[in-house]
From Swiss-Prot:
Annotated localization: Nucleus
Function: May be involved in transcriptional regulation.
Annotated organism of origin: Rattus norvegicus (Rat)
Region of interest (Disordered), residue spans: 135-248
Name of this chain's protein: Zinc finger and BTB domain-containing protein 8A
Keywords: DNA-binding, Isopeptide bond, Metal-binding, Nucleus, Phosphoprotein, Repeat, Transcription, Transcription regulation, Ubl conjugation, Zinc, Zinc-finger
SMART domains attached to this UniProt entry: BTB, ZnF_C2H2
Length: 441
């Protein structure tokens, strides 16, 4: 039978012992402030303390002291309280410092809680932004609905009803409260995001819209004016032609002032289409850095936390970015591998040998040595000195020649690291004559 309250009661007793400095055998010094704790508790709660205390496990009788300069005492107080109570006190001001200290101390539970806290704060900020933009969309939508009424009232002031100046399909659209449906106009909330228009397209749009909003000819107006006289018809036709010319001129000058509710000008696009404009969505809550994607923000937060989640499988070194790890592995570990010149396979000092032909040296594996018939190489000391790997470039490799050979041949001094050849030549007879001539006077 398991008693769930036993764990919490045990933590309370240990925390009380820590506060009263009872059986505390470990001291942690953080920027001059000393914290008392128990080895067993620190060993069980932190991977860093587990590694540190296991190295000093033989000296259990002596008290252990650990010093840290990477985080502040307030940050370590939050972590130590979590170790002894299971309660983590996170705020918007200390979450980055606590996460950085937990990453250094290798406390995965604290890191996961800090990540969840940061993600929740980002979600809240995103919801506030979405709410703000939804309210702005409603405002722009209400402005777009009211514009047809302004358009119709302007025609009423000129002396005619709006129904008399529109085609038969346009009249019911205004009465039903859904204006300009025949011209593919939708409120801002129903529109799908579109890319920003180019400058030359924006200039051509007002002219195109005058064609779509073309007013009917006088003959069409006569068709709707039932019971009116011919004189009334001619006067109204003349009035419509003048009004049509005036509207076209106004639309070319300023499409917004003419009452077009779906004009694609720069001003209206910024009011009705806030989502079309490029806006940076994610802002770091601890600095002024702003990014577009959540993955970029997650990578940026590692600058504050010091987290390095990508370890090198060869040497164990950790990196904060995956491209840094691949570059490290390619330049450090792969570049130093020895390769057989013939088969291009990786060889070692045991599976290959260095072959020297004159001043040229290269490495061959044992199989390639057997194929080329060089398996019976002399094993005396002089030849062994020439079999030097590229890593032993600091050793001095010289030709061992007798004095007679030095007189007759050119002495070659070879540098193993850079494969440089330096020739030391005796002075010729011509140079000796030049040195003697100044003395004969």
């Amino acid at each position: 039978m398991e008693i769930s309250s036993h764990q919490s009661h045990l933590l309370e007793q240990l925390n009380e012992q820590r506060r009263q400095d009872v059986f505390c055998d470990c001291s942690i010094l953080v920027e001059g402030k000393v914290f008392k704790a128990h080895r067993n508790v620190l060993f069980a709660s932190s991977g860093y303390f587990k590694m540190l205390l296991s190295q000093n496990s033989k000296e259990t009788s002596q008290p252990t002291t650990a010093t840290f300069q990477t985080f502040s005492p307030d940050t370590f107080t939050v972590i130590l309280d979590f170790v002894y109570s299971g309660k983590l006190s996170l705020t918007g001001q200390n979450v980055i410092e606590v996460m950085s200290a937990a990453s250094f101390l290798q406390m995965t539970d604290v890191i996961s809680v800090c990540k969840t806290f940061i993600k929740s704060s980002l979600d809240i900020s995103e919801k506030e932004k979405d709410r703000y933009f939804s309210l702005s969309d409603k405002d722009t939508g209400s402005n777009g609905v009211e514009r047809p009424s302004v358009y119709s009232s302007s025609w009423q002031e000129d002396g005619g009803s709006p129904r008399s100046h529109l085609s038969p399909d346009q009249g019911p659209a205004i009465v039903s409260g859904k204006p300009w449906n025949k011209y593919s106009y939708h409120p801002a909330s129903q529109r799908s995001p579109q890319p920003p228009l180019a400058k030359h397209e924006q200039r051509k749009d007002p002219i195109k819209k005058t064609k779509h909003l073309r007013l009917p000819q006088p003959s069409e107006v006569v068709h709707f004016k039932s019971g009116k006289g011919d004189a009334r018809t001619s006067d109204s036709g003349h009035h419509v032609s003048q009004s049509e010319e005036q509207v076209q001129v106004d639309a070319e000058v300023d499409p917004v002032s003419a009452g077009y509710p779906y004009s694609q000008g720069p001003e209206v696009a910024s009011r009705s289409f806030p989502d079309n404009l490029p806006r940076l969505r994610f802002k770091c809550p601890y600095c002024t850095h702003v990014v577009k994607r959540k993955a970029d923000l997650k990578r940026h937060l590692r600058c504050h936390t010091g987290e390095r989640p990508y370890p090198c499988q060869a040497c164990g070194k950790r990196f904060s970015r995956l491209d840094h790890l691949s570059s490290h592995f390619r330049t450090i570990h792969q570049a130093c591998k020895l390769i057989c010149r013939k088969c291009k396979r990786h060889v070692t000092d045991l599976t290959g040998q260095v072959v020297q032909e004159g001043t040229r040296r290269y490495r061959l594996c044992n199989e390639c040595l057997t194929e080329v018939g060089m398996d019976s190489l002399p094993a005396d000391l002089e030849t062994e000195q020439h079999r030097v790997s590229p890593a032993d470039g600091d050793k001095d490799c010289r030709w061992h020649l007798s004095e007679e050979e030095n007189r007759s041949y050119v002495e070659i001094v070879e540098d193993g690291s850079a494969d440089l050849v330096i020739q030391q030549v005796d002075d010729s007879e011509e140079e000796e004559e030049k040195e003697i001539k100044p003395n004969i006077r």
